């Protein structure tokens, strides 16, 4: 009934074009959101084992593990991934409210996951904080180069 006027036809055509555009964009956006969620869950799944490894390593040395020790590990990795900033600093700089990981890009989350997984292994091998920090910085650069080469 709306189509009986010229304005009605224009409105209908507008909505048809909107639906066509949505059908073109929706699969791409859905795929991107799915990949971001996978990266976020992966990063989350490696954090707990890293913390557990840290606690075991410190216990074997006869040391207690305080909350600041976990924070130090997270800050070390975040500084590598987030250009020298802790997650808190990065969130403030980018105006992020809530959990900074929820606002990180897929690449940042994958990078963080890689570093958490590698850090867990280095902790289990008995490597100290300064040595792990240096090793992770070097491995991070290699990982980034490999990622860039793979995209070309």
Regions found by a protein language model. Name each.
Residues 2-152:
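Positively charged, phosphate-engaging catalytic surfaces used for nucleic-acid and nucleotide handling
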């Amino acid at each position: 009934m709306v189509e009986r006027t010229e304005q009605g036809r224009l409105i209908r055509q507008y909505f048809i074009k909107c639906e066509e555009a949505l059908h073109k964009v929706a699969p791409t956006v859905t795929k991107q959101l799915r990949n971001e969620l996978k990266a976020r869950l992966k990063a989350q799944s490696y954090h707990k084992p890293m913390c557990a490894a840290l606690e075991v390593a410190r216990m074997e040395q006869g040391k207690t593990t305080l909350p600041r020790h976990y924070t130090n590990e997270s800050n070390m990795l975040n500084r590598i991934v987030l250009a020298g900033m802790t997650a808190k600093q990065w969130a403030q700089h980018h105006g992020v409210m809530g959990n900074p990981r929820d606002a990180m890009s897929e690449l940042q989350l994958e990078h963080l996951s890689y570093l958490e997984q590698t850090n867990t292994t280095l902790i289990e091998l008995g490597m100290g904080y300064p040595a792990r920090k240096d090793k992770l910085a070097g491995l991070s650069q290699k990982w980034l180069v490999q990622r860039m080469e793979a995209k070309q």
